[in-house]
Amino acid sequence: MDIPGAQESAANSSNSSLGATLSTSQTERNKSGHITAHRQSFAEDQRRPPPSPRSHRHPSLTQQAVQELMNHPPINRHANPQYAGRNWQEIAVGELAVADDVKWTDLDESVQDATLTLLKNHPTNAVLVRETPTSKRAISTFDYSDLNAYLLVVVGLAKPEEEQIELYDHIAKSAQAQTPVALREIQPILKKSELVALPAEATLDAAVEAFGSGIHRLLITNSAGEVIGILSQLRLLEFFWKEAVNFPVIDRLYGSVLRDLQIGSTQIIAVNADGPLADALLLMHNEGLTSVAVVDQGLNVLGNISTADLRLLTSTNNLPLLKRSCMHFISVILNERGVEHGRDSFPVFYVNPYSTLAHTVAKLVATRSHRMWVVETASPSPSAPATPLLQPVQLGVTAATAPPPTSVTGVGSSSSPGPQPTVLVSSQTPSAPQSPLPGQSFPSVPSASLPGAHVSGRLSGVVSLTDVLNLFAKSSGLRPSDPSEQRARRRRSSSASVRPSLDAGRGSVDFRR
């Protein structure tokens, strides 16, 4: 997901350090005990939700024109002399490496300083971590998922194992005292996956196999083992989008529709629009996700929350957002994009089963997202919010179910009907904060308060960068490993230090993308 600008405002407000920002909740925990169970009505609490930028901005294109553009995205039909006539599997990964993408921090730098570097490094959404300031060898990374893990510890949502209680208390107390916390100190709570590196002379077939297996980024190294670039799933997909005319095996896939290709998953985790933002952050951490769909009680997709949106929570003034609803946070995101950066907030985080692969890839590249939500025809939403769902909801019972495919042309596909869509909606109850966050209890914004809230449709699936690159790999005769192994590994390392994941409320199918 694209991070607007270089976040100068966050850098300039260094007097409100991340440690000081997050420590406020620890002080309030000692004063307040538990969050009050009494909840005021929507009418009392949300008379004035943040205005949408649409209310005072006139987009340069009409909504219909934007939709038409997304339905028929332009593709570069002119062969690039650099790649014309070449087999993409023989292109060196070093040709795609960009030296400016490599930003460093070291283990002895504070989380606050590392966060400021991360906010400025929007191309890769990651900062490389090294042992010393002069080293060129990475030993880890620091990204928004790591920032999320740190935030959850400091605000009191984390439940450590017995042997880590002392460490968690130390981190929280240091933040409360506004004492810088070094990256070295928080490494045990991050439980990072092993870094994967490729020499610059390695070819793209190795990168596509790795990405199609669920690896999110690769380090590009020179002959001395020093990092000279970072290749991400998104960067590689962007390359295939722009240069597809040079590679017929890839280019011919773009005209196929998702339903025929049978890529993606029909089992999805989502969050309720009326649930607190803290629940969404906890869910993403527990499940090893970088983004999650926000749905109403009719399972209509209302928006998308990403770990990259944590950039909006790094100042003291914004910390109370953790207790406000996911819908309210979406309105904040829209305002930040539309007002501060002049971007039209037209929602583009979804596709439908009859969208072409070209349409889907165009949206992934344009929004810099890790996944697109697959939706069916929009359905009415109940006027009064019901109790958030805890168990899997079979869309065949409570919502429209997509018709089974009758003809399949995709790689690894079959003529048998696919599994019925299942959406697991996070509950507010089990993941409520153990300690109160600053200020009073903040309510949710009614889902109907945002213009265009129901234009997407009912959630029925998800297509990720991994899915698309896995398709490219198999179409080219490569044999990527099962992506579910990587996803399960990320989730196990994440959920071990916070709270139980949603395994008890779903089947055995792994669907983290």
Curated annotation (Swiss-Prot):
* Record-annotated CBS domain positions: 190-249, 264-321
* Keywords tagged on the record: CBS domain, Cytoplasm, Nucleus, Repeat
Put simply, this protein is called Protein SDS23
Spell out the molecular function terms from Gene Ontology. Answer: protein serine/threonine phosphatase inhibitor activity
Q: Does the keyword Ion transport apply?
A: no
What's any one GO cellular component for it? cytoplasm
Q: Where is the composition biased (Polar residues)?
A: 424-447
Q: Per the annotation, which location comes first and is thus the protein's main one?
A: cytoplasm
Question: Which GO biological process annotations does it have?
Answer: cellular response to glucose starvation; regulation of mitotic metaphase/anaphase transition
Q: Where is this region: Disordered?
A: 1-62, 400-449, 474-513
> Where is this chain compositionally biased, Low complexity type?
9-25, 400-423
The record's similarity note reads:
Belongs to the SDS23 family.
Job description of the protein: Involved in DNA replication and cell separation.
Pfam families for the chain: CBS
Q: Which SUPFAM superfamilies match?
A: CBS-domain pair
The record's subcellular location field reads: Cytoplasm; Nucleus
